[in-house]
């Protein structure tokens, strides 16, 4: 949300609106990110942007929802590539989200030993910078410079092209890396198993979600998705161990 607010402030847009959209649009993220989203979409229609809207409309405040403006809700729903936000603040959030993903995923890959700075093509480093932070700063400044006094939020052709090449590089060398892919497959399996368990054993759901089953006409599968989508990575692993991994026998 900080990147979105920084860009919105520099462009003299509504900073609070940009931050509200940025904070709200991640509420529907599942444990293990896109792997968790894929797992829930495999077993039940699930989209994290739609889930984010569901959280603020139907789940918060004991099911009463939040009284958000149309502009915030529009930005939350349309922050993905397929959507088109109707405000400049929504467009700022959508673009800054892409920049944040590149920054964090590359930083994680370098820290995890999957990549080194030297692996990144020299021409991309020449344009964007020689560190994760430098690349993020380059892209943020480029967005601000090229969007100032414009009717759309965009980057310069050179930096935009470099960013897309960097994302392509990340897909080929990180997201499709056998080590990362193996961990993703484990996460998909685990979330799928949890979903099946809770659908069969709704008594294991927390009271808030059991009450939702009785008091609303939402499908059982939707309520289970609501619960799982709100888990952290570590909590999902904990519940998986609780239900599927036998404890050591005390003899």
Spans of model-derived segments:
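A generic, well-ordered mixed alpha/beta core segment in the N-terminal half of proteins
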Residues: 21, 26-62
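Histidine-centered, transition-metal-coordinating active-site segments
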Residues: 1-16, 46-251
């Amino acid at each position: 949300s900080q990147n979105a607010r920084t860009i919105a402030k520099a462009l003299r847009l509504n900073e609070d609106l940009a931050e509200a959209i940025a904070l709200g649009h991640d509420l529907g993220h599942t444990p293990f990110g896109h792997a968790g989203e894929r797992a829930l979409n495999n077993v039940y229609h699930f989209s994290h942007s739609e889930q984010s809207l569901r959280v603020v409309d139907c789940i918060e405040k004991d099911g009463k929802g939040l009284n958000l403006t149309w502009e915030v809700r529009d930005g939350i729903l349309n922050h993905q590539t397929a959507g088109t936000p109707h405000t400049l603040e929504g467009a700022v959030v959508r673009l800054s989200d892409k920049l944040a993903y590149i920054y964090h995923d590359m930083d994680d890959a370098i820290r995890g030993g999957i990549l080194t700075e030297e692996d990144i093509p020299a021409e991309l480093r020449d344009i964007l910078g020689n560190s994760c932070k430098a690349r993020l700063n380059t892209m943020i400044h480029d967005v601000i410079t090229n969007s100032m006094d414009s009717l759309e939020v965009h980057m310069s052709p050179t930096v935009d092209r470099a960013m897309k090449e960097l994302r392509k590089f990340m897909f080929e060398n990180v997201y499709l890396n056998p080590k990362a892919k193996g961990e993703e497959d484990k996460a998909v399996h685990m979330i799928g198993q949890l979903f099946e368990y809770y659908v069969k054993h709704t008594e294991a759901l927390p009271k808030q979600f059991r009450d939702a089953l009785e008091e609303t006409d939402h499908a059982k599968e939707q309520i289970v998705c609501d619960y799982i989508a709100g888990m952290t990575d570590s909590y999902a692993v904990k519940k998986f161990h609780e239900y599927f991994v036998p404890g050591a026998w005390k003899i």
